[in-house]
Amino acid sequence: GFPISGEFLRTDNPEIVAKHQGKVYGKASVGAPPMSVLHLDTRVVDGQASLLFGPYAGWTPKFLKNGSWFDLFASIRWHNLGTMIGAGLKNLDLVWYLVTELLATRKKRHEALQQFAPKAEMKDWYLITAGQRVQIMKKGPDGKAVIQFGTEVVSGADGTIAGLLGA
């Protein structure tokens, strides 16, 4: 698998949050994966209302938010290296999308936010990492590398460990 994180711009400013009650979706960019559709969303956690805008793709080699910096590298083996490379080559539009997301400046993200909230000011928003997942890459029924969207339970051959991968 390949680790991907979801990042959002967030504001806790009560004046801004009070003006938005709900969720507003935009339209996906050409070549962008379906889970990347930008949206503005009110969230309440522990009684604190916030407004989130995103998601933006983030990256770390960790499989979990608090995982090891070596997770990805420790998972690469001779038997899965070809699948990982093949999945990337077969999905160059997705790879390009991820690279451009990772290189996006704060200003560029703010410009996207202003399409939803024209009066939004950068000083009121900060970037958070909302979650971490592992994108499934495996051999398909035809033996060729595929990136699988959705979720899948993966377990060790001896059944002593299992995990849920995907989004």
Model-derived segments and spans:
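Glycine-rich loops and low-complexity Gly/Arg-rich segments
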Residues: 32-37, 76-80, 153
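Alpha-helical membrane-targeting segments
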Residues: 59-107
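Glycine-rich phosphate/pyrophosphate-binding beta-alpha loops
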Residues: 161-167
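Flavin (FAD/FMN) cofactor-binding core of flavoprotein oxidoreductases
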Residues: 3-7, 12-14, 86-161
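Internal hydrophobic alpha-helix adjacent to the cofactor/substrate pocket in enzyme cavities
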Residues: 73-78, 112-114, 119, 167
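Charge-rich, low-complexity amphipathic helices
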Residues: 31, 46, 74-75, 135-139
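Flavin-dependent oxidoreductases
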Residues: 1-69
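Short, low-complexity, polar/charged sequence segments that are solvent-exposed and flexible
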Residues: 27-31, 70-75, 144-147
